Amino acid sequence: MVKRSILLLIKVYQYFISPLTGPTCRFYPTCSQYAFEAVMIHGSLKGSCLAVRRILKCHPFHPGGYDPVP
């Protein structure tokens, strides 16, 4: 139940909020796609922790690049 709720929130962000901000993510896959995959693979708790860690790395002083879900 929690996992589905988190995945739904991520999809709402991807379809309705992200298009308004434009492409700003420094990574591939994007942070929202990374979060979706992390929750799908690792579950709601560990996936959310991985997603938060990734989002904290997404800033102008980080080079970005390819960073797949472990």
From Swiss-Prot:
GO terms for cellular component: plasma membrane. It is a peripheral membrane protein. Pfam families: YidD (PF01809). It is found in: Cell inner membrane. Keywords: Cell inner membrane, Cell membrane, Membrane. Its main location: membrane. Belongs to the UPF0161 family. Could be involved in insertion of integral membrane proteins into the membrane. This is Putative membrane protein insertion efficiency factor.
